[in-house]
Amino acid sequence: MLSRLLRDDKLLEVFFSSLDMKKSYLLALSGGSDSLFLLYLLKSRGVAFTAVHVDHGWRESSYREAEELKIRCEEEGIPILIDHVPPEYRTSRDPENAARRYRYTLFHKVCKEQNLAGIFLAHHANDQAETVLKRLLEGASLSNLKGMSPKTSYEDIPLFRPLLHIPKQIIINVLDAENVPCVQDITNTDERYLRARMRKKIFPWLEEIFGKNITQPLLTLAQDSEELSCYMKQQAEPFLENMRKENTTWSIEIPQVLIEQVFLTKWVCKEFFFRAGVVASRHFLQTVYDHLQRKLPAQMRLRDKRVIIKAGVVMIE
């Protein structure tokens, strides 16, 4: 079944055709269905990689499971490193994020030490839908609902997520058909964590209320957001070419033709502030736009900077 999936999945084909097969990579291997699926996928495509498993110590059985993973990888001829999260990370105020930071720091370190060209992560379509819904409910802007990208980076190391379009159920079906045993991580269903509550309660409740699957509409929204973001970057760049820096003062001209386009004006201002080294909130951008639109001069504080608005000009110093 795995070979049939490879043959029929055009997005996977495009992804692997662009991958530098002369290099070696790192696979973040939890031992769950998603990362095991990715392990066999990479192996079937002839990708050279080292698996890295991080034992978080959240379950009594986790040490034994790590050893079983090591044996499985050795039987498959796959190099594997096992690491254990120090106890202080498990007792922090936010153990989930603390463990995540530990993992990524470790992955980065291993990549540097072994000259690995990137990190493979097994996030799938359901993970993507959760990310989009979470960002939507947190009030993210339209252009920030795009979710995770198939190719990003952590510091200077590329991150690859080739499974973002594949639903969790397909992954499970393939592994069941191949009789591949997986680790069942109980933290994935522990309702102390937001992601677990989303999987166990929020998504099932929404699908029951709407009477249909909501994963695909959220993935479509993420794609629309990605396309909007790309379009806005193209539209904004000619105006951002007007940015100037003199000593410690940044400035940009905001012509009337731009002010007539509300969304684009706020996008240009947001990017201007970002390139000048500060992040502007949605409320702050609206205030800046209101002054530009009404031609009202103003001075405001943004973090430790002073923002000056004059006729058709925004400055930050």
UniProtKB/Swiss-Prot annotation:
Gene3D superfamilies: HUPs (3.40.50.620). One of its GO terms (cellular component) is cytoplasm. GO terms for molecular function: ATP binding; tRNA(Ile)-lysidine synthase activity. Its EC number is 6.3.4.19. The keyword Transmembrane helix does not apply. It is found in: Cytoplasm. It comes from the Bacteria. ATP binds at S30, G31, G32, S33, D34, S35. CDD domains: TilS_N (cd01992). It is an enzyme of class 6 (ligase). It catalyses: cytidine(34) in tRNA(Ile2) + L-lysine + ATP = lysidine(34) in tRNA(Ile2) + AMP + diphosphate + H(+). One of its GO terms (biological process) is tRNA modification. InterPro entries: Rossmann-like_a/b/a_fold (IPR014729), TilS/TtcA_N (IPR011063), tRNA_Ile_lys_synt (IPR012094), tRNA_Ile_lys_synt_N (IPR012795). Keywords: ATP-binding, Cytoplasm, Ligase, Nucleotide-binding, tRNA processing. It holds the Pfam family ATP_bind_3. The keyword tRNA processing applies. The N-terminal region contains the highly conserved SGGXDS motif, predicted to be a P-loop motif involved in ATP binding. Ligates lysine onto the cytidine present at position 34 of the AUA codon-specific tRNA(Ile) that contains the anticodon CAU, in an ATP-dependent manner. Cytidine is converted to lysidine, thus changing the amino acid specificity of the tRNA from methionine to isoleucine. Belongs to the tRNA(Ile)-lysidine synthase family. This is tRNA(Ile)-lysidine synthase. It comes from Chlamydia caviae (strain ATCC VR-813 / DSM 19441 / 03DC25 / GPIC) (Chlamydophila caviae). The lineage of its organism: Bacteria, Pseudomonadati, Chlamydiota, Chlamydiia, Chlamydiales.
